[in-house]
Swiss-Prot record:
<dbReference type="InterPro" id="IPR022669">
    <property type="entry name" value="Ribosomal_uL2_C"/>
</dbReference>
<feature type="region of interest" description="Disordered">
    <location>
        <begin position="212"/>
        <end position="276"/>
    </location>
</feature>
<comment type="function">
    <text>One of the primary rRNA binding proteins. Required for association of the 30S and 50S subunits to form the 70S ribosome, for tRNA binding and peptide bond formation. It has been suggested to have peptidyltransferase activity; this is somewhat controversial. Makes several contacts with the 16S rRNA in the 70S ribosome.</text>
</comment>
<keyword id="KW-0699">rRNA-binding</keyword>
<keyword id="KW-0694">RNA-binding</keyword>
<dbReference type="InterPro" id="IPR022671">
    <property type="entry name" value="Ribosomal_uL2_CS"/>
</dbReference>
<protein>
    <recommendedName>
        <fullName>Large ribosomal subunit protein uL2</fullName>
    </recommendedName>
</protein>
<dbReference type="GO" id="GO:0015934">
    <property type="term" value="C:large ribosomal subunit"/>
</dbReference>
<dbReference type="GO" id="GO:0019843">
    <property type="term" value="F:rRNA binding"/>
</dbReference>
<dbReference type="Pfam" id="PF03947">
    <property type="entry name" value="Ribosomal_L2_C"/>
</dbReference>
<dbReference type="InterPro" id="IPR014722">
    <property type="entry name" value="Rib_uL2_dom2"/>
</dbReference>
<dbReference type="GO" id="GO:0003735">
    <property type="term" value="F:structural constituent of ribosome"/>
</dbReference>
<dbReference type="GO" id="GO:0016740">
    <property type="term" value="F:transferase activity"/>
</dbReference>
<dbReference type="InterPro" id="IPR014726">
    <property type="entry name" value="Ribosomal_uL2_dom3"/>
</dbReference>
<keyword id="KW-0689">Ribosomal protein</keyword>
<dbReference type="InterPro" id="IPR012340">
    <property type="entry name" value="NA-bd_OB-fold"/>
</dbReference>
<feature type="compositionally biased region" description="Basic residues">
    <location>
        <begin position="257"/>
        <end position="276"/>
    </location>
</feature>
Length: 276
């Protein structure tokens, strides 16, 4: 997928780039698969900001995606590739012989006219097919991986992402995550074959503040530009550096400090991600 750039007619256009949308074939979305999501803008039920630098953004409707892929042994046909405002990957509209319509994440290489199928048993290894991890050959790249059987895919769902099946041990399959983390996942969990499409999304340059405002991202103020009452880095005459290690507004060390709490599932992690 090509990246489209612009001539610098204005300063904001100079570094801005967008994805070419020639791969999008749909003129409109399926009404029955659209729903509204309440925009919280980073506020909780008391109206207080719990996540900074967020706002409403442009109005959009949520597309209901079939992450479970639980329509087994029925072949569906891809009739459209669509844009989804809630994710950076494209979505594919699949129509089944009984008239059922579902959206799935579009893997790289899946196009209009292709057939997809999901099954609890074994299938051919083709892009867009979904099956249980125990039936997928070692070395295959997969996406939309479940963490609990029947819960729906939760891993490797964004544009260009994929995980690789590295081996099996008892009732578990060993997966190498996009972060290079190695972990066990129950072999009864479902996964889809292939790499999530729209891989060039990572190369897009936002270029101007207005595009981020449309995405619901507000400006972020540096702590060193604040007063001491507002941030540990605040205060001082002129551009004063921080004393000690950088911290968050609440004093938690920044830049690599581990804040993840221990979980029962830690025993399923074989090795952590490798830092570049």
């Amino acid at each position: 997928m090509a990246i489209k750039t612009y001539k610098p007619y204005t300063p904001s256009r100079r570094f801005m780039s967008v994805l070419d949308s020639k791969d999008i074939t749909a003129k409109s979305s399926v009404k029955g698969l659209l729903t509204k999501l309440k925009a919280t803008a980073g506020r909780n039920n008391n109206g207080r900001i719990t996540s900074r630098h967020k706002e409403r953004g442009a109005k959009k409707l949520y597309r209901i995606i079939d992450f479970k892929r639980n329509k087994y042994n029925i072949e569906g046909k891809v009739v459209a590739i669509e844009y989804d405002p809630y994710r950076n990957a494209r979505i594919a509209l699949v129509v089944y012989p009984d008239g059922d319509k579902r959206y799935i994440l579009q893997p790289s290489g899946l196009k209009v006219g292709d057939s997809v199928i999901a099954a609890e048993g074994g299938l051919d290894i083709k892009v867009g097919f979904a099956m249980k991890l125990k039936n997928i050959p070692i070395g295959t790249v997969v996406h939309n991986i479940e963490m609990h059987p029947g819960a729906g895919g939760q891993l490797a769902r964004s544009a260009g992402m994929s995980a690789q099946i590295m081996g099996r041990e008892n009732k578990y399959t060993i997966i190498r995550m996009p972060s290079s983390e190695m972990r066990y996942i129950l072999s009864e969990c479902m996964a889809s074959i292939g790499v999530v499409g729209n891989e060039d999304f990572i190369n897009v340059s936002i270029g101007k503040a207005g595009r981020n405002r449309h995405r619901g991202i507000r400006p972020q103020t540096r702590g060193s530009a604040m007063n001491p009452v507002d941030h540990p880095h605040g205060g001082g005459e002129g551009k004063t550096g921080t004393s000690g290690h950088p911290v968050s507004p609440w004093g938690t060390p920044a830049k690599g400090y581990k804040t993840r709490k221990k979980k029962a599932s830690d025993k399923l992690i074989i090795s952590r991600k490798k830092h570049k």
